[in-house]
Amino acid sequence: MESTQSIGIRELLEAGVHFGHQAKRWNPKMKRYIFAERAGVHIIDLDQTLDLLERALNFIRGVAEAGQDVLFVGTKKQAQITIAEQAIRCGQPYVAERYIGGLLTNFRTIRPRIEYFKQLSREVEETPEEERSGKEWFARLREYQKLRRNFAGITEMERLPGAVYVVDPKREELLVREANRLRIPVVALTDTNCDPDVIDYVIPGNDDAIRSISLITRLIADAVIEGRGEESAAEERPVPPAVEEAQMVEEGRVPAGGEEQPGEPEAEAFEEAAGEPEDSTEEEAAEEQAASQAAPVGEGDESEER
């Protein structure tokens, strides 16, 4: 198990944690965490990252030691597998595919749907092979697959978490607003295009590169395990098929969303190392807007356009 005492600037550099977004995409509120600008890309101050990471890990240990849950959230393609694997490893709930509006603010209302999903899961798993055909079976299977996308990681979440850990708080704006409203502390891997003012424990770092996400998320999971005084809590549990399928679709492809800069090879090299940001699809944006309207959480700052 790795601790920040064995993590230094070199490890953060190797993981690409220092690469921010293109300077033109920055949020000025992140200025205090930026070391420099190079080839049009902001470079994050890793000395601050180390200090703030240790602060965040100490907080997470305290939450776990108190017996409270830490909800892991990261729905972008680069984060899905890591979020699921590390949350499972430390026995915590997670959202790796789609955050349902109102999960926190309307938890009592959503909880019965989670119980229904658990019941449906048992029915699907226990259905004999010879009965797995016909219109009724496929209708049930489609419903199961849809609910699995929403609830697979939170089936054991019986109460609101003591904290949430987020990869890319800009993408997960709805979750952050709900947590802020309920005064649930937010720990977040926060890139240079994010608003740090809505985050309780900012970890300045690259939230697009897989290695950066994996390193920070693994340390968060280690802190949970340390806080509970346990070994890995659930190593035998596999990553849900829906998450694996989503990752397989993307295998061998660079997530879309970044703007190319023809004629600036150095800038392109920085963008490649930093990890291309992934934009939400129009369908996902519409779903999130509908969810937000269905479960209002109060006024929040609008995220700047990527």
UniProtKB/Swiss-Prot annotation:
Superkingdom assignment: Bacteria
CDD domains named in the record: RPS2
GO BP: any one term: translation
GO-annotated cellular components: cytosolic small ribosomal subunit
GO MF entries: structural constituent of ribosome
Keywords of this entry: Ribonucleoprotein, Ribosomal protein
Bias (Basic and acidic residues) ranges: 229-238
Keyword Ribonucleoprotein assigned: yes
Positions of region (Disordered): 229-306
Disulfide pattern: none
Keyword flag Methyltransferase: no
Biased composition (Acidic residues): 261-287
UniProt cross-references to HAMAP family, sorted A to Z: Ribosomal_uS2_B
Family statement drawn from the similarity comment of this UniProt entry: Belongs to the universal ribosomal protein uS2 family.
Name of this chain's protein: Small ribosomal subunit protein uS2
Organism: Rubrobacter xylanophilus (strain DSM 9941 / JCM 11954 / NBRC 16129 / PRD-1)
Encoding gene per record: rpsB
